[in-house]
Amino acid sequence: MIKKIAVLTSGGDAPGMNAAIRGVVRSALSEGLEVYGIYEGYYGLYHNKIQQLTRYSVSDIINRGGTFLGSARFPEFKDPAVREKCVEILRSHGIDALVVIGGDGSYMGAKLLTEEHDFPCVGIPGTIDNDVAGTDYTIGYQTALETAVEAIDRLRDTSSSHKRISIVEIMGRHCSDLTISAAIAGGCEYIVASEIEFNREELIKQIERAIIKGKRHAIIAITELLCDVNELAREIEARVKHETRATILGHIQRGGTPCAFDRILGSRMGVYAVDLLLQGKGGYCVGIQNEQLVHHDIIDAINNMRREFKADWLAMSKRLD
């Protein structure tokens, strides 16, 4: 029977993680469990940065961005000897199970602890990229979306005033959910998504045709890592003879007060993760599909399940141009 659980946040931070931590802590305490917080993710676990938490430890954090437990990259966790030491540390505290909040890399760590050491872990999807399989939404995505849309709205104001083309680079790595959704909500004229081949020449020709028709300004939304957006801006300006500037939103998308959706989602997922552990269901990850909380085998979430590209959304955006 589980008596003590721990919780950590790993990888890139996301608004709403604190709500998930709070959900884990308070729901576990309500069931008579002891709860421990692991500071700075897997790095902190390896260095024994573990502290018992009370309900007051998570007071007044639901409205705060980031994660009060902190997070860190820890590539050394790939070493089996490092993982073995981490399990030894957990067991030295009498901890029976672990809740991991993060993205696919964090899930991989939880998967290895479960597979190699039969240590019960449950994953909660926390990343602004919305790129975790087995869930419609990840914690932090909606807040990051609002941040990106606000930035696009501001860029439109100044682009309109100066007859300028603006390129806005949006986070997401290999998943363009954030880019496509922000572009539709912000009324962007062009979308460059990571899931489809980037045809630079076709993009420039589209802009040229629009300018010939009298368009005064435009906004191009592009997913990060596809190209050097500043270089692209210079090329567009040289070709179409229209002032063009690039804006990289960067880590501003990860910060800020979490929206109500992410606070509620984090709370629900935190409680659900504890319920799974109480039912003896380690090795799973939490998700939300069609507004219902669900769980999947964490191995399937990593190896077999793939998020569907929003191709229909992208097609719709072209009809709205």
Curated annotation (Swiss-Prot):
It catalyses: beta-D-fructose 6-phosphate + ATP = beta-D-fructose 1,6-bisphosphate + ADP + H(+). ADP binds at residues 22-26, 55-60, 156, 187-189, 213, 215-217. Pathway: Carbohydrate degradation; glycolysis; D-glyceraldehyde 3-phosphate and glycerone phosphate from D-glucose: step 3/4. GO terms for molecular function: 6-phosphofructokinase activity; AMP binding; ATP binding; fructose-6-phosphate binding; identical protein binding; metal ion binding; monosaccharide binding. Its cofactor is Mg(2+). The active site is at 129 (proton acceptor). The keyword Zinc-finger does not apply. This is ATP-dependent 6-phosphofructokinase. The gene is pfkA.
